A protein has these predicted regions:
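Glycine-rich phosphate/pyrophosphate-handling loop used in enzymes and phosphotransfer proteins
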Residues: 1-172
Length: 172
């Protein structure tokens, strides 16, 4: 039947969940089916940028961009999680951060599907956007591109194509 996983696929996902349970991207505690860690949630609230999350152009260089936004300040548990995704091979952390970013910036409802967080579709949120283009980063050393992994949940929630090769990285 369409939309349902086969018995063997369900069993494989359950085994993966048992062997590799979901962890908090910020402190690595086992979460199970909780969307966020009860210990880190208050820490994240302290790092929230407030109701307006657009980056201040007087403090951040945006180049040719019309604007940019970030749900949290780059400090504390947020900084640690990003650095682990970049330098410690935790690609799952980048995806979980992308889900959290999508929920905070666009108000996506986060759902659990077989022990994986998935942001729900956000009707109408993509108006004015054509695609999602992650900032180019090197993936040679780590085997994956952190910004691309973070952008995947956002593209899914907005129903937009993800174009990871639309920009190329240039060293100045």
């Amino acid at each position: 039947m369409a939309g349902y996983y086969s018995r063997s696929a369900q069993l494989a996902r359950q085994m993966r969940q048992l062997l590799f349970p979901r962890r908090c991207p910020f402190c690595r505690r086992v979460l199970g089916t909780l969307p966020l860690c009860e210990v880190c949630t208050p820490r994240l609230e302290e790092l929230r940028r407030g109701p307006v999350m657009r980056l201040d152009v007087s403090r951040h260089y945006l180049g040719a961009l019309d604007g940019a936004a970030a749900p949290y300040r780059y400090e504390g548990v947020v900084r640690s999680a990003i650095l682990r995704a970049k330098y410690e091979g935790e690609s799952w952390t980048a995806v979980e951060l992308g889900v959290e970013m999508t929920a905070r910036l666009f108000g996506a409802e986060v759902e659990m599907h077989f022990a994986e967080l998935v942001p729900g579709l956000i009707p109408g949120a993509a108006i004015g956007y054509d695609c999602i283009v992650p900032v180019p980063a090197t993936s040679r050393r780590r085997g994956y591109n952190v910004p691309e992994r973070m952008a995947q949940p956002l593209a899914h929630a907005l129903g937009l194509p993800l174009l990871p090769k639309a920009l190329c990285r240039v060293r100045a």
